[in-house]
C-alpha cells in the first residue's frame, strides 16, 4: 500500500512539473475564470499574454455549481483565478481559504462595486415546489453595459498590478474592448431613452441593473418555466394579470417551448421572447460567432418590442409592503422602553466615509432608485445629516465615551423615557432618551437614540442627538443626525449595509 501511495505521489509530482514546464515553455499566463462573462472580459484584457480557461461551461447552472476536485486542482495550478462575486459563485470563499495565495493570484471582478439587495430568482413551476436562487446581494451587474465596463476596468487594473511587465498590453487590449462596450452602452441609452413602456416582465429576475441604469423597471414573474406549461390555476392567474396590465411580452432566459408559447398566446394573449442572462454560451453560439456584445444587442432588440409600445406602468403581481416598522409605520402599543445595553459596543461615525467618497455609489443608487434627487443632491443632504466631530462612541450598559478631537469624554447615563415623533411624510419615529448623571457632561448631558426600532433589540447602527440644553430642544433637530456603525466594519461594508436596508 505504501509503495502504491509513493508511486501515485511521484506521478502527481511529475504531472505538476510537466504542467509547470509547459507554462514556462509558451511563456503565457495560465488564468482560470469561473463563468462566461468573467471569461470573456478576462480574455479580452489578457489577449495573447495568457491561456484563459472557462471553468463552468454551458449546461451547468453557475448559481448551483460546486467545483470538483479536478476543478480545484486546476485553480490551484493557475497563475491567476478570476471570479465575479461571492454572491454569484457562492463556493469561492471556502476555496479561497485553502488557496495558496503566494502562488495563485485572485481577482474579484466586481472589486469595490456595491451591489443591490438580492432576492429570489424565480425559476421553475411553483406548482411543483421548485425553488429559485437566493442571493443576499444581486450579482448580475454584467447585464448592464455601463457596469460591464467597470468589470473590465477592474480586471485590467488587477492584472496590471500583478503583472506590471504586461501592463501596456493589458491597457491597450482593455481600451479597444471598452470602446466596443461604450458603443453598446450608447446603443442602450439611445434605444431606451424614449421608452413608451418602461416596465418589462421577465421569468428570470436578473436584469435589475440593466433596468436601473437605462430608466426601466424589471417586473419579475413567478411560476413559469421555459420548457413546461403552467397549471390551469396558474394560467388563469397569469391571464388575469396580463390583461389587467396590458402586457405584450413575457421574457424567458431561453426560448420557450412552442407548446408554452402557443398556450400563453391563446389563453393569455401574450407573446414570449428571450432576454439572455449571459451566464453561458453554448458550443453552437460560439461557432456562430456569438459573444457578449452580440447577445446584448439581441437583448436590446428584444426589450424594444416592449418599450416601443405604449402602455400603463406594469405593477408586480404581489405588491411589496413598504409600511413597515423600519420605515416608520407602527402602533403606539408596539413602542417599549429600552436600556442603554441595546446600544452597547464600540461605534464609529460614518461621516469620514462620506467625505472620502466611499458612499458615492450609495447616493448614485438612491438617485436612480427613487428619482427624487440627483446623486449630488443626495450627497449634500447626507453631508448635513451625518456631519459631526465625534469620531467614535464607546457604550456600556450605563456609560458613554465620546471621542472628539482626539480627546475622550466619558459619562454615566440613566434612561428617562421615549418620544414618538411624526414626520412631514406621515411616517413616524421613536427617540429613546438618556440623561447624564454627571454634572460636567456639558454638550453630552442629554442624549437621544433613533435606530428604526421601537422595542428592545440590539442596535445594528443608530442616529444620535445630543446637547446641553434639554431633551425638548433636541426634538426640534431634524436635519443633523450623526450616524454610527460598529467600528470593526470597513467603509465599504457599511456602504453595502446601507444599500441592503
Swiss-Prot record:
Region (Disordered): 116-136
Lipid attachment site numbers (S-diacylglycerol cysteine): 19
An MF annotation (GO) of this entry: zinc ion binding
Entry annotated with the keyword ATP-binding: no
Record region (His-rich loop): 120-136
UniProtKB keywords: Cell membrane, Competence, Ion transport, Lipoprotein, Membrane, Metal-binding, Palmitate, Signal, Transport, Zinc, Zinc transport
Superkingdom of source: Bacteria
This protein's GO CC annotations: plasma membrane
Membrane topology: Lipid-anchor
GO terms of biological process kind: cell adhesion; establishment of competence for transformation; zinc ion transport
Record-listed Zn(2+) binding positions: 63, 140, 204, 279
Lipidated residue numbers (N-palmitoyl cysteine): 19
Ranges annotated as biased composition (Basic and acidic residues): 125-136
Compartment(s) of residence: Cell membrane
Signal peptide location: 1-18
PANTHER family in the record: HIGH-AFFINITY ZINC UPTAKE SYSTEM PROTEIN ZNUA, HIGH-AFFINITY ZINC UPTAKE SYSTEM PROTEIN ZNUA-RELATED
Biological role stated in the UniProt entry: Part of the ATP-binding cassette (ABC) transport system AdcABC involved in zinc import. Binds zinc with high affinity and specificity and delivers it to the membrane permease for translocation into the cytoplasm.
UniProt family annotation: Belongs to the bacterial solute-binding protein 9 family.
Domain comment, as recorded: The His-rich loop facilitates the closure of the zinc binding site and is required for zinc acquisition.
Protein name listed in UniProt: Zinc-binding lipoprotein AdcA
Organism: Streptococcus pneumoniae serotype 4 (strain ATCC BAA-334 / TIGR4)
Gene this chain is encoded by: adcA
